[in-house]
Amino acid sequence: MVMSGGTFWRNQSGATMVEAAIAMPVLLTLLLGFVDFGYAFYQWNAGNKAVQAGARLAQISAPIASGLLLEAKTPSDPLDVGKAVPANTYSYICTASAAGAVSCSCGTGATCQNLNVSQAAFDFIFSGSSSRPGMLTFLPTLLKSEVQIQYQASGLGYWTRPSGPVPTITVSIVNHPFQFFFLAGFLGFGTITMPSMLSTATGEDMKSTWTP
């Protein structure tokens, strides 16, 4: 049957199918995009919890940088605690290779006693123990090479440990990737690098630096 031109242009049969074909890709992109970005925010929050846990372990554990043991101790006079830190004081920056081997460098403008390291101390902060969760507990996709731990002179003191250096400890996660799942197929999104995450704490009961 041949349909006249006027009737053809007024015919709306099949319009719903056309509208669905237009709307469904947009709807699916929005819906699955919410899932992907929700998972990204979940990983972001997990990363922040990981650096908080790492900073807490670092401030109560033996330092990774062995040279910290040789640094100037907290002033014996409590009135001197909190005064300005002299130039060229210590700043140990510890990172791990892709294989997980830790090494430390001296921060720009700082003076460090030596750059010997404790692999066990780094592994404890990263992995934790049976009784204490480490960074990996909160972010299972984390790699050792993405963790940076810095011990820097602060001029602060810790009242219950007057004979040991009290560094400012900063634990960071850098270059941690996020892989899109749904949007990788829909829009070609690949892997992105998440912004750096860090947590800073003042050293407390670092037992290897404590002298009764």
Question: Model-flagged regions — what are they?
Answer:
Residues 1-13:
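N-terminal leader/signal peptides at the extreme start of proteins
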Residues 2-3, 52-212:
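Short, conserved structural patches
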Residues 5-8, 38, 190:
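Short N-terminal micro-motifs specific to bacterial/archaeal maturation
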Residues 11, 20-23, 40:
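Membrane-interface junctions
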Residues 16, 21-35:
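Alpha-helical hydrophobic helix detector
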Residues 32-35, 39-40, 55-59:
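Short amphipathic alpha-helical interface segments enriched in basic and hydrophobic/aromatic residues
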Residues 39-48, 61-64:
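Membrane-proximal amphipathic alpha-helices
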